Amino acid sequence: MNLEGKNVIVTGGSLGIGKETAKALVDKGANVLITGRSNKRLSKAVNYTGAKIIDFDIADINNITRNANECIKMFDGRVDVLINNAGLGVRKSIEELSIDDFLKVFNVNVFGLALFTKEIVPLMKIQNSGTIINIGSTASLKGYKTGSIYASSKFALRCLTQCWQAELRPHNIRVCQINPSEVTTAFGNPLRIEREDISNKLTAKEIAHSIISAIEMDDRGFINELNVWATNPFN
């Protein structure tokens, strides 16, 4: 896909992977709309990315349709690429598990994501084209200690991705999941303060590069899943 002039929505675009991806897309000539919960962070992201913004919480399930329609309206009814990047993570031992924590994470990582995508897909079907990028995690590949909530949400997203691939390929809609390993972003920080780059860890720019590469493949093909690891994070 040639990104010049394409309409792209990036959820969770005010920080980290979403912000870097939005900037890279704008630099490629795409029309980009980023969503996020904090108007203050979104306003800062505008200066960095050059993207349009809209503030809403993807976990607000009851208003998903209204919020999606606002996004669609800002693009005059055409969406070429949807990047489902908004995500939430917690670490809890088995003894600490609660339904509130499960719902808090799943409402963002699974339920809100799926219902927002549901609103965008009919446009792509009419267009007979489109690309959906789900930002997963290497936590979707193998469980780990204290990962009961977060990892299971990413396992669920991986399954959604595979189901959508089977369902949407006949409509020329490509669905890809990008699974980053540890990235130096604000992810997991309750104050949403971005971490300093560490020389041997992945940064948001590497993940943005992976996302752009998957999108820019000619539409006759697609990458179904891409795992992104730091080369040597062990030192």
Language-model regions, residue ranges each:
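C-terminal helical subdomain
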Residues: 170-171, 177-178, 185, 193-235
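Active-site helix of classical SDR
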Residues: 117, 153
